[in-house]
């Protein structure tokens, strides 16, 4: 059975973009013989405060926890055949994490949202807007 590691920003069924782009296909993929491992960067508790005013400490803590979750995901690469990335694997900084996935030799499917290209220049530097260009250049398959 082929295994797909799905790296996404938000918990399953929480974000409309994820539901519309790929979550609706989970049952079909599993019926076709794929085993899915899903890993969101943000936890449900972080999602609950992410877009609200305040809660800065919870947002920072949730982001740090997300990076630890992604480090743990590197160990899951051995058991998967394909890595499916929706929007980004990590939200900030250089595409180092994405480079590690590339160096693992796993095929990457990159499903990007056009919103990743609508960042202002200073926000793009912080959020790693060039990650999308890196993933577009190095992925085996691109979905837009």
What do the predicted segments below correspond to?
Residues 68-80, 92-110, 116-117, 124-143:
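Membrane-proximal helix-turn-helix segments that form the acceptor-binding/catalytic region
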Residues 37-47, 113-117:
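Short connector loops at secondary-structure junctions
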Residues 85, 143-144:
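Short beta-strand scaffold positions
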Residues 41-72:
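A short, charged, and often flexible helix/loop element on the N-terminal side
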Residues 51-54, 122-127:
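Surface-exposed, active-site-proximal loop segments in enzymatic domains
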Residues 14-15, 46-48, 91-94, 117-120:
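Short catalytic/ligand-binding loop motif for oxyanion handling, primarily in non-cytosolic enzymes
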Residues 1-41:
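N-terminal subdomain of nucleotide-sugar transferases
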């Amino acid at each position: 059975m082929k295994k797909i590691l799905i790296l996404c920003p938000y918990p399953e069924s929480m974000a409309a973009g994820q539901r519309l782009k790929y979550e609706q296909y989970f049952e079909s993929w599993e019926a076709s013989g794929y085993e899915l491992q899903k890993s969101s960067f943000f936890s449900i508790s972080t999602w609950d405060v992410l877009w609200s005013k305040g809660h800065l400490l919870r947002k920072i803590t949730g982001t740090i926890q997300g990076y630890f979750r992604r480090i743990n995901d590197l160990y899951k690469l051995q058991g998967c055949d394909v890595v499916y990335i929706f929007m980004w694997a990590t939200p900030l900084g250089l595409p180092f994490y994405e480079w590690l996935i590339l160096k693992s030799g796993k095929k990457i499917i990159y499903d990007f949202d056009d919103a990743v290209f609508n960042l202002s220049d200073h926000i793009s530097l912080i959020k790693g807007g060039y990650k999308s260009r890196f993933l577009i250049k190095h992925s085996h398959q691109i979905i837009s």
